[in-house]
């Protein structure tokens, strides 16, 4: 039940003309083929072709979902063929938290991650252990029930830098002025935690000011 290698041959239909970002979907996913797993050797070959169909121009989120879909479907197929429970086969091949930093079989080096813990938490919240009982009950009522499983990694950013300024006044209060801004991810909370950890300040004494050109 150990993953030894992954080989991918991908033919991508770009449509009749090359649009901006058209090759993102078939190429940006390459590093993501490693997923959260210890697959030591990964080979990927991508061929982009033109056709008489509409051109491809992805807007958001393209590339990474394709990689996760490929890997997780392969794992499910392997689990069925080998008779190994699908959570167990994933567990046997998941990168351990104490193995970080971890160089994957293709492109990326992970600096941190508790992938098995994440999977266990999701299984607990989904009451995975009792799923078969729920399935049988559903089938008895003439309906079908299924459950999916996938471990997904997301490329969060590129390697471009960003600035942050920290001002500390005479009272010991810190004002953090980051170059990036929060739009739903809770950056302000994260900034306070980081500054508190590095400078030894209480989080109540840290103020985060975002998108204010007057400062």
Where are these regions (language model features)?
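Helix-loop-helix junctions that connect adjacent transmembrane helices in secondary transporters/permeases
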Residues: 94-173, 193
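Glycine-rich and small/hydrophobic secondary-structure elements
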Residues: 2, 56-81, 104-127, 199
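Gly/Pro-rich active-site capping loops and adjacent beta-alpha segments
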Residues: 2-67, 139-215
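Long, well-ordered alpha-helical segments
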Residues: 47, 72-77, 81-90, 198-209
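Molybdopterin (Moco) oxidoreductase catalytic core of the xanthine/aldehyde oxidoreductase family
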Residues: 2-28, 81-120
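Active-site-proximal helix/loop capping residues that flank conserved catalytic or ligand/cofactor
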Residues: 37, 69, 87, 113, ...
